[in-house]
C-alpha cells in the first residue's frame, strides 16, 4: 500500500496563522480518526458551517486549564470513564450579543470567540449550551496525545491564544473517516494534513520540558552508575536518571521507567512490588553493561504520597488498588510519560528495550515517538501482602504477571 504523505508541521502552523482549517490525525492505535482544527480566535460562521457540513461530528472548543478556571468551567463529570478520557467541561452558550438559539453557525462562532476574549466573564456564558469546551493539559501533546491538546498547541505555535476549534470527521455513511479518505478530503478542500505524532516530534525538537541540572557519580551495592537530576520546567519537580555505560544514537537501550515509591523503595513495604522491581532492574542493567533507570517523581501512579496512603486505607477496608484510586476521584493510573520521553531524548535514546510488564506504559512511550524494540519482562515473586494487589494489576490493568495456568 502506498504511503500517504503528510504535510509538515511548519506548513500547518502557517495555515493556522492565516486563519485556515487543517486536518489532524491521531495514532492508528488510539482513535485513528481525523479532526478539522482551527484557532479559536479565527473562527467564523463560515468555518462553523463548513465543519458541521463536512465534518459531521461534534464541534468542541479546546482551551487551557487556566482559561477554564477563569471562566469557572467545571468538568462535565467528576469521574471521567470515557475511553480516552476526553476532558469535557459543562457546555456553554454566549448570552446576549445577538445570540438567540445558540446552535446557529453565527451563535456558535460568537460563543467560541467569547471563550478566548479576555473581557468575557463567567456570568456571560449560559450553562448548558451548544459549545463543548475541552480542558487541555498545560503541556499539550507532550502530556496527552490527543486532538484537544493538538488544537491548543497549534494555536499557540501560530501566535494565538491557546484555544482552538475541532470536530471529528465522519464519512457520508456515518462511520469515521480514516487516513485514505482524510487525504482525499484534504486534497478536495486544499487543506494541510498532519499527524499528532509529527506535532509531538516537532515540539520535542523545538522546545524543552526539562532542564538537566546536575550529574554525579553514584556507586551502589548493585554496581557503579551515574546519576543525573532533571528539573521539570513547568512544575519544578525533580526526576532522576540512573545511568550505566554509553551507547550509539540509534542503539536500542535497556530502560526502566520507574515511578517513585517511598513506601516500597525506601521502607521496603511488602504491599507492592516497587522496591524489588527497582533493584531487579538495576541488576539487569548492571549485567547488561549499559542502560537507564528513569526515577520519575510520580508517587502512587501519579496521585502523590498522601493520597496513596489514603488509597492504602481504603484497601484495608476491602477495595482493590484500582477501586481505591477511583473512589478518591483519580484515574486508575494518573501518570503521563511525556516528561520521561523528553528525558530519554536528552540522553540520546530513541530506541528502547523497555523493562516493563505494563502494556499501557509501552503504548504511552511509543506515542511520544520512541521506538520500543522489545518489552523485557521483570519477574518478581509475590508475597502474602501483595498477592491481591498483583492480581488486580494483572486482571484490571493488563500487566503480564502471575500468569494463569
Swiss-Prot record:
Biological pathway: Cofactor biosynthesis; riboflavin biosynthesis; 2-hydroxy-3-oxobutyl phosphate from D-ribulose 5-phosphate: step 1/1; Cofactor biosynthesis; riboflavin biosynthesis; 5-amino-6-(D-ribitylamino)uracil from GTP: step 1/4
Site (Essential for DHBP synthase activity): 130, 168
Reaction catalysed by this enzyme: D-ribulose 5-phosphate = (2S)-2-hydroxy-3-oxobutyl phosphate + formate + H(+); GTP + 4 H2O = 2,5-diamino-6-hydroxy-4-(5-phosphoribosylamino)-pyrimidine + formate + 2 phosphate + 3 H(+)
CDD domains according to UniProt: GTP_cyclohydro2
GO cellular component: cytosol
Transmembrane segments: none
Protein's name according to its UniProt entry: Riboflavin biosynthesis protein RibBA
Source organism (scientific name): Cytophaga hutchinsonii (strain ATCC 33406 / DSM 1761 / CIP 103989 / NBRC 15051 / NCIMB 9469 / D465)
Recorded name of the encoding gene: ribBA
Amino acid at each position: 500500500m502506498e504511503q500517504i504523505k503528510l504535510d509538515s508541521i511548519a506548513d500547518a502552523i502557517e495555515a493556522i496563522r492565516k486563519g485556515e482549517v487543517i486536518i489532524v490525525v491521531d495514532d492508528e492505535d488510539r482513535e485513528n480518526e481525523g479532526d478539522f482544527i482551527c484557532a479559536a480566535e479565527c473562527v467564523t460562521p463560515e468555518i462553523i458551517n463548513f465543519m458541521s457540513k463536512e465534518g459531521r461530528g461534534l464541534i468542541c472548543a479546546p482551551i487551557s486549564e487556566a482559561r477554564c478556571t477563569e471562566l469557572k468551567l467545571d468538568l462535565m463529570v467528576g469521574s471521567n470513564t470515557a475511553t480516552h478520557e476526553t476532558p469535557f467541561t459543562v457546555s456553554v452558550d454566549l448570552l446576549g450579543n445577538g445570540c438567540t438559539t445558540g446552535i446557529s453557525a453565527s451563535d456558535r462562532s460568537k460563543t467560541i470567540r467569547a471563550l478566548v476574549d479576555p473581557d468575557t466573564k463567567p456570568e456571560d456564558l449560559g450553562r448548558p449550551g451548544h459549545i463543548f469546551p475541552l480542558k487541555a493539559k498545560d503541556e499539550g501533546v507532550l502530556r496527552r496525545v490527543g486532538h484537544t491538546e493538538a488544537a491548543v498547541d497549534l494555536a499557540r505555535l501560530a501566535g494565538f491564544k491557546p484555544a482552538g476549534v475541532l470536530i471529528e470527521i465522519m464519512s457520508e455513511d456515518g462511520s469515521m473517516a480514516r487516513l485514505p479518505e482524510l487525504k482525499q478530503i484534504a486534497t478536495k478542500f486544499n487543506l494541510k494534513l498532519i499527524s499528532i505524532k509529527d506535532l509531538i516530534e516537532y515540539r520535542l525538537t523545538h522546545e524543552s520540558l526539562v532542564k538537566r541540572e546536575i550529574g554525579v557519580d553514584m556507586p551502589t551495592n548493585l554496581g557503579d552508575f551515574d546519576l543525573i537530576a532533571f528539573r521539570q520546567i513547568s512544575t519544578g519537580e525533580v526526576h532522576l536518571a540512573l545511568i550505566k555505560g554509553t551507547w550509539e544514537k540509534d542503539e536500542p537501550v535497556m530502560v526502566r521507567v520507574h515511578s517513585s515509591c517511598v513506601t516500597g523503595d525506601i521502607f521496603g513495604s511488602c504491599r507492592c512490588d516497587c522496591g524489588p522491581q527497582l533493584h531487579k532492574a538495576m541488576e539487569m542493567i548492571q549485567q547488561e553493561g549499559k542502560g537507564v533507570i528513569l526515577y520519575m517523581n510520580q508517587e502512587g501512579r501519579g496521585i502523590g504520597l498522601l493520597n496513596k496512603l489514603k488509597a492504602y486505607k481504603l484497601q484495608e477496608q476491602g477495595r482493590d488498588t484500582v477501586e481505591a484510586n477511583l473512589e478518591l476521584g483519580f484515574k486508575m493510573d494518573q501518570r503521563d510519560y511525556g516528561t520521561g520521553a523528553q528525558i530519554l531524548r536528552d540522553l540520546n535514546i530513541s530506541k528502547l528495550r523497555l523493562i516493563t510488564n505494563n502494556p499501557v506504559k509501552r503504548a504511552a512511550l511509543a506515542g511520544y515517538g520512541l521506538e520500543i524494540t522489545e518489552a523485557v519482562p521483570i519477574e518478581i515473586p509475590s508475597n502474602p501482602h501483595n498477592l491481591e494487589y498483583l492480581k488486580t494489576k494483572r486482571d484490571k490493568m493488563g500487566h503480564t504477571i502471575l500468569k494463569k495456568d
